[in-house]
Amino acid sequence: MCGACASERRSWDRARAVLRYDKHSRHLVLGLKHGDRTHVAGAFGRWMHRTGSDVLARADLLVPVPLHWTRLFQRRYNQAALLAQAIRSAGGPEVAADWLVRRRRTPMQGRLGPAARERNVRGAFAIQPGRSFAGRRVVVIDDVMTTGATVEECARVLNPRTKAGGGRIGRGSDIGPGVAGRGIAAAQRPGLAL
């Protein structure tokens, strides 16, 4: 996450990264994201569990960033959900894979600038009808965090202090080229991603 992005006020409180996204990690991360290399999710998940252990120890649920159904159909898997399941297998909290949904298809964020990324995901997520995050500490899991726009929008929807909020959220980290998860704790003040 760039310095300018990290200095913005957020609806979430902390982030953890397992890998820095650079020329060395790019192949691994993009292999999971776009190359059907789902076998690396296990290693990333173990790294995420270890790196985010302080956050995960207080979490009730892992919520992977959802894909729109059309992208899920094309890709055949949600890489954030695979990471969340791997964290769970390493001793992490329960995974709520279908509790947050992507209401509309959004263009991929990769080539967008910070402001365009925020606009792109604004209003894209919603809490699945019949699900409640009330009283639960949630860690949002994503595969890559660049500006934090996607996690910010998920956190905004989940955070009870926002108009769109739906429950108490615990925070964790994110997985970028192998990062940890993120979350939001209603009892905690928003802060910088670390």
What are these regions (language model features)?
Residues 1-141, 147-194:
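Conserved PRPP/pyrophosphate-binding segment of the phosphoribosyltransferase/PRPP-pathway fold
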